[in-house]
Amino acid sequence: LRALEVYRETGETISEHDRKSRETPDRYDALYIGLSFRDRQDLRDRIDRRVDVMVEQGLLDEVQALLGSGLPRDATALQAIGFKQFLAVADGTAAVADAVEEVKLRSRQYAKRQLTWLRRNPDIHWILWEKEPDFPQALQNATEFLTAAGVC
């Protein structure tokens, strides 16, 4: 759909449009700061805990409320990680425990894809966190980076 939209608006294929976009110089000199756990297992554990909290705070109720509001089952919102798996629970075609494990798996896979994509950018200043992030240290690290770049 996006490719068709680009073609209609520009008369270019999506690959041509993307190539030209990459060749165009950036308008601004951007600075990038990335946050990452030093140990990947800590990230996985945090994702798993976050999914557990989402379920405890009513993910299934939220899915049922969306369905009750008349949102079509094929709506984009219901295809998101978490909603898609719990839509099956709401339909009675999946068990809660299975849906929880699937949400955890899909979330970890998504996080891995995000980090893989971000790590291709050599301009990102990475702040590595331990199991329990040290926010004051991260702030100091970011401030030092920005100061050295002439921003602060």
List the predicted regions and their residue ranges.
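Phosphate/Mg2+-binding loops and adjacent switch elements
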Residues: 1-30
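Catalytic core of IPPT-family isopentenyl/dimethylallyl transferases
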Residues: 25-152
